[in-house]
Swiss-Prot record:
Its main location: cytoplasm. The gene is OPTN. It is found in: Cytoplasm, Perinuclear region; Golgi apparatus; Golgi apparatus, trans-Golgi network; Cytoplasmic vesicle, Autophagosome. It comes from Homo sapiens (Human). GO terms for cellular component: autophagosome; cytoplasm; cytosol; Golgi apparatus; Golgi membrane; nucleoplasm; nucleus; perinuclear region of cytoplasm. PANTHER family: NF-KAPPA-B ESSENTIAL MODULATOR (PTHR31553), OPTINEURIN (PTHR31553:SF2). This is Optineurin. GO terms for molecular function: identical protein binding; K63-linked polyubiquitin modification-dependent protein binding; polyubiquitin modification-dependent protein binding; protein-macromolecule adaptor activity; zinc ion binding. Residues 1-32, 101-143, 186-209, 261-297 are annotated as: Disordered.
Length: 577
C-alpha cells in the first residue's frame, strides 16, 4: 500500500482540503473566533472525513457514469448494426420491386402484341369462308370454357386484391396515413411512377396495390381479348355459312343448266333424225330451218349461262380454298391461344406467389420500420437522460469546486488564527504520523519481499514435490527390486544353511571315519595328538560360525537387528515415514 503525507490533504488543484458535502456552499459559516483549538481540530477531522466520503461518492458516481456510458456506446453500436441490416434488407426489397416492375412492363408489351394480333385477325376478309357446324360448335364450346375459366380466375384475383386492400386499409389506419391506397383503376405506369417517387413504407405498400391492380387489369384485358376473338370467330362462321349457301345455289343452277343442255341435245338429235327421214317436203324443210335457228340461239344462250356458272363455281372454289386457309390460320391461332391460356394460370400462380412474398416482405419492412422508430424513441429518451445526467454532473462539479474554494478560504483563515504551539503539535503529530507511515511502508515492503520469497519458496516446493514424487516412484521401484533381492538372498541363505548342515554332517562323518581309521591303524600317541588337533580345529570352526552369526546391522530408531544392508535401508525408510 502506498501512503500519502497528511500535509498534502487534497488530490486536485493543490488545495489543502475538500468540501464537507453537508450543505450548499452559499450558507453562512460560523465565526471561528468562538471555537477552541480542540474544537477546530475536531471540525477539521470531520471535514477531512466528509471530504473523504465525498471523494468516494464522486468516484462511485464516476464509475457508474462510465458504466452507463459504455452500455450506451454498446447499445448505439448494436443499433448501427441493426440499421445497416435493415438498410440491406430494404435495398433487396427495392431490387425485387424493380424486377417486378420490369416483369410488369414485359407483360404489358406482350398484351399489346396480343391485342395487335387480334386486331389484325379481325381486319382480315372473311366474306366467303365457311366451316362445318360441328367444328364451329366445338370451337365455341372451347372458347366459352376458356372464358369461364378466365372469369373464375379474375374473380379469384379480385377477391385477393380486395383482401389485400382491406389489410392495407387496416394497416394504414394504424400507422397514421403512412400508406396510400388508390382504388381507381388507372394505368399501371402511373402507379409504378408513384411507387418510384413515394418515400418509405408508402412506396412498399403502393407497389403491392399497383401489382394487384395490374393483375386485375391484365385479367380484364385477357377477358376482353377473348371476347373479341369470340366475336370474330362468330362473324367468320356466319360468313362461311353464307358462302356455303351461295355455293349450294350455284350447284343447283349448274345442275339445272346441264339438264336443259342435255334436253336440247336430245331434241337436236331427234330433229336431225327426222330431217334424214323426211327430206321430200319443202314445207317441212322450211319449218326445220326455222327450228334449228331457234334451237342454236337457245344453245348459245345456255352455253353462255354455263360458262358464267363455271366462272362463278371457280370463284366459289377459290373463295372456299381461301376460307379453308383462313380456317387453318384461325385453328393455328386458337391452338396458340390455348397454349397461352394453359401457360397463363401457371404465370398467374407464380405472380400471385411473388405478390404474396412481396407483401410479406413489405409487412416485414413495416414491422422493422416500427421497431426502428421505437428504438429511435428509446435512444432519444436515453440521450435526454444522459444530457440530464451530464447537467447534474456539471452541477456537482461546480458545487465541488465551490466547496473546495470555501475550504481553502477556511483553512487559510484557520491557519492564520491557529497558535504556533498548536501548529508545532500538529507538525510533530504529522511528523510522527509520517514516520509511522514510513515504518509501516517499510514493513509493507519487507512483507512484500517475504511474500515474494514465500512465492518463490512455493514454486520451489512445487518443484520439490514433483521431484519427491519422482523419487518416491523410483524408491518404490527400488524397494520392490530390493525385496525381490532380499527374498532371493533369504532363499540362498536357507540353501546355504542346508549346505552347511550337510557339510557339518559330512565333516562329522569324516571325523568319525578318521577317528576310526586312526584307531585302527595309528598309534595311540599320535591319536591323542590328532584328536587334540581336530578338537582345536572344530573349536575354531565353531568360533568362526559364531562370529559370522553376530548381528552387525541394527536400526538406529527402533534397534531392530537386520541381516544385511539392503533390508536395513528398507526398514529405516519405513520407520522414518
Amino acid at each position: 500500500m502506498s501512503h500519502q503525507p497528511l500535509s498534502c490533504l487534497t488530490e486536485k488543484e493543490d488545495s489543502p482540503s475538500e468540501s464537507t458535502g453537508n450543505g450548499p456552499p452559499h450558507l453562512a459559516h460560523p465565526n471561528l473566533d468562538t471555537f477552541t483549538p480542540e474544537e477546530l481540530l475536531q471540525q477539521m477531522k470531520e471535514l477531512l472525513t466528509e471530504n473523504h466520503q465525498l471523494k468516494e461518492a464522486m468516484k462511485l458516481n464516476n464509475q457508474a457514469m462510465k458504466g452507463r456510458f459504455e452500455e450506451l456506446s454498446a447499445w448505439t453500436e448494436k443499433q448501427k448494426e441493426e440499421r445497416q441490416f435493415f438498410e440491406i434488407q430494404s435495398k433487396e426489397a427495392k431490387e425485387r420491386l424493380m424486377a417486378l416492375s420490369h416483369e410488369n412492363e414485359k407483360l404489358k408489351e406482350e398484351l399489346g402484341k396480343l391485342k395487335g394480333k387480334s386486331e389484325r385477325s379481325s381486319e382480315d376478309p372473311t366474306d366467303d369462308s365457311r366451316l362445318p357446324r360441328a367444328e364451329a360448335e366445338q370451337e365455341k364450346d372451347q372458347l366459352r370454357t376458356q372464358v369461364v375459366r378466365l372469369q373464375a380466375e379474375k374473380a379469384d384475383l379480385l377477391g385477393i386484391v380486395s383482401e389485400l386492400q382491406l389489410k392495407l386499409n387496416s394497416s394504414g389506419s394504424s400507422e397514421d396515413s403512412f400508406v396510400e391506397i388508390r382504388m381507381a383503376e388507372g394505368e399501371a405506369e402511373g402507379s409504378v411512377k408513384e411507387i418510384k417517387h413515394s418515400p418509405g413504407p408508402t412506396r412498399t405498400v403502393s407497389t403491392g396495390t399497383a401489382l394487384s391492380k395490374y393483375r386485375s387489369r391484365s385479367a380484364d384485358g385477357a377477358k376482353n381479348y377473348f371476347e373479341h376473338e369470340e366475336l370474330t370467330v362468330s362473324q367468320l362462321l356466319l360468313c362461311l355459312r353464307e358462302g356455303n349457301q351461295k355455293v349450294e345455289r350455284l350447284e343447283v343452277a349448274l345442275k339445272e343448266a346441264k339438264e336443259r343442255v342435255s334436253d336440247f341435245e336430245k331434241k337436236t338429235s331427234n330433229r336431225s333424225e327426222i330431217e334424214t327421214q323426211t327430206e321430200g317436203s319443202t314445207e317441212k324443210e322450211n319449218d326445220e330451218e326455222k327450228g334449228p335457228e331457234t334451237v342454236g340461239s337457245e344453245v348459245e344462250a345456255l352455253n353462255l349461262q354455263v360458262t358464267s356458272l363455271f366462272k362463278e363455281l371457280q370463284e366459289a372454289h377459290t373463295k372456299l380454298s381461301e376460307a379453308e386457309l383462313m380456317k387453318k390460320r384461325l385453328q393455328e391461332k386458337c391452338q396458340a391461344l390455348e397454349r397461352k391460356n394453359s401457360a397463363i394460370p401457371s404465370e398467374l400462380n407464380e405472380k400471385q406467389e411473388l405478390v404474396y412474398t412481396n407483401k410479406k416482405l413489405e409487412l416485414q419492412v413495416e414491422s422493422m420500420l416500427s421497431e426502428i422508430k421505437m428504438e429511435q424513441a428509446k435512444t432519444e429518451d436515453e440521450k435526454s437522460k444522459l444530457t440530464v445526467l451530464q447537467m447534474t454532473h456539471n452541477k456537482l462539479l461546480q458545487e465541488h469546486n465551490n466547496a473546495l474554494k470555501t475550504i481553502e478560504e477556511l483553512t487559510r483563515k484557520e491557519s492564520e488564527k491557529v497558535d504556533r504551539a498548536v501548529l508545532k503539535e500538529l507538525s510533530e503529530k504529522l511528523e510522527l504520523a509520517e514516520k509511522a507511515l514510513a515504518s509501516k511502508q517499510l514493513q509493507m515492503d519487507e512483507m512484500k519481499q517475504t511474500i515474494a520469497k514465500q512465492e518463490e519458496d512455493l514454486e520451489t516446493m512445487t518443484i520439490l514435490r514433483a521431484q519427491m514424487e519422482v523419487y518416491c516412484s523410483d524408491f518404490h521401484a527400488e524397494r520392490a527390486a530390493r525385496e525381490k533381492i532380499h527374498e532371493e538372498k533369504e532363499q540362498l541363505a536357507l540353501q546355504l544353511a542346508v549346505l552347511l548342515k550337510e557339510n557339518d554332517a559330512f565333516e562329522d562323518g569324516g571325523r568319525q571315519s578318521l577317528m576310526e581309521m586312526q584307531s585302527r591303524h595309528g598309534a595311540r600317541t599320535s591319536d591323542s595328538d590328532q584328536q587334540a588337533y581336530l578338537v582345536q580345529r572344530g573349536a575354531e570352526d565353531r568360533d568362526w560360525r559364531q562370529q559370522r552369526n553376530i548381528p552387525i546391522h541394527s536400526c538406529p530408531k527402533c534397534g531392530e537387528v537386520l541381516p544385511d544392508i539392503d533390508t536395513l535401508q528398507i526398514h529405516v525408510m519405513d520407520c522414518i515415514i
